[in-house]
Curated annotation (Swiss-Prot):
Signal peptide: none
Complex and partners: PSII is composed of 1 copy each of membrane proteins PsbA, PsbB, PsbC, PsbD, PsbE, PsbF, PsbH, PsbI, PsbJ, PsbK, PsbL, PsbM, PsbT, PsbX, PsbY, PsbZ, Psb30/Ycf12, peripheral proteins PsbO, CyanoQ (PsbQ), PsbU, PsbV and a large number of cofactors. It forms dimeric complexes.
Coiled-coil intervals: none
Any one GO biological process: photosynthesis
Ranges that cross the membrane: 8-28, 41-61
Pfam families: Ycf9
Localisation: Cellular thylakoid membrane
Major localization listed first in the record, in broad terms: membrane
Species annotation: Nostoc punctiforme (strain ATCC 29133 / PCC 73102)
Cross-referenced InterPro entries: PSII_PsbZ, PSII_PsbZ_sf
Lineage: Bacteria, Bacillati, Cyanobacteriota, Cyanophyceae, Nostocales
Gene3D superfamilies: Photosystem II PsbZ, reaction centre
Protein name in the entry: Photosystem II reaction center protein Z
Role played: May control the interaction of photosystem II (PSII) cores with the light-harvesting antenna, regulates electron flow through the 2 photosystem reaction centers. PSII is a light-driven water plastoquinone oxidoreductase, using light energy to abstract electrons from H(2)O, generating a proton gradient subsequently used for ATP formation.
HAMAP family the UniProt entry points to: PSII_PsbZ
């Protein structure tokens, strides 16, 4: 269970870094807004799911 928690936490941290860089870039480039909008929604949904998963796994690990 600890390994799954660590992978989920690493995934959350990496996705957070990607979103911190990607969201301002997506808002700054209006040419690809239609494609960027879908990626932002998917990235945000995955990020929220990972937050809940890490919270749930933290309950079982600690």
């Amino acid at each position: 269970m600890t390994i799954i928690f660590q992978f989920a936490l690493i995934g959350l941290v990496l996705l957070s870094f990607v979103l911190v860089v990607g969201v301002p870039v997506a808002y700054a480039t209006p040419q690809n807004w239609v494609e960027s909008k879908k990626l932002l929604w998917v990235g945000s949904a995955v990020w929220i799911a990972l937050v809940f998963l890490v919270g749930l796994l933290n309950f079982f690990v600690v």
